[in-house]
Amino acid sequence: SRGLGDVYKRQVVAYAKGSLGMEPIRSQGHIHKVSPFSQWSTPEVYEIWNGEAVIYMQESATDEPGRCYAVYAQPGDVVVVPPYWVHATISTNADESLVFGAWCDREYGFEYAEIRRHKGIAWYPVFEGDGLKWIRNTNYHFSELVRKAPREYHDLGIGKGKSIYKIFEDAPDTFLYVPNPSVKKEVWISFEP
């Protein structure tokens, strides 16, 4: 069995300011591969440190994308992506860089096949005026896009105003669900970002 120090991949990620034509700087949509440790696709925990972000997520990469969310996050906000969900990280302000922490299982990898078959995520952003406009990808069946702020994840041991690093320092077992999502199976069943 692996210890907590072995299972987390802690990343500091920085996106340059700017855009790619009308599109914001963003990651390619992906799903985390099933971990050989847990036999689950693993969640990801984001904490925004600089800039403005949207963590886009959808339940599935099949023709029926399920629920689709654009979670708008500011510095200090935490956003959790559940196991098996498609997700992408988007910088929403072309005038500043986006810097964030991202935690996932160290054995993670990405699944792209179904997303590529659909030519991307179910909704993709473009800059329009001072904000983002979301365009539906017609390679998926229609699913409404819910735009929202991050919630407090009390069911996962995360509240507002305390960094995930401080939470980990004080109580590392809080994040056992990152390498072993089954310990929070009941949360993932009806997950709301």
What are these regions (language model features)?
Residues 58-68:
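Short, structured beta-strand/loop micro-motifs enriched in basic residues and often containing a Trp
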Residues 72-93:
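Conserved metal-binding segment of the jelly-roll/cupin
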Residues 15, 39-60:
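Short, conserved beta-strand element in jelly-roll/cupin
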Residues 49, 57-59, 83, 91, ...:
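Short, structured patches in soluble enzyme cores that scaffold and shape functional sites
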Residues 63, 92-193:
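Double-stranded beta-helix
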Residues 12-41:
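Conserved short histidine dyad/triad with adjacent acidic residue
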Residues 3-8:
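Short, small-residue-biased leader/transition segments that mark boundaries at the very start
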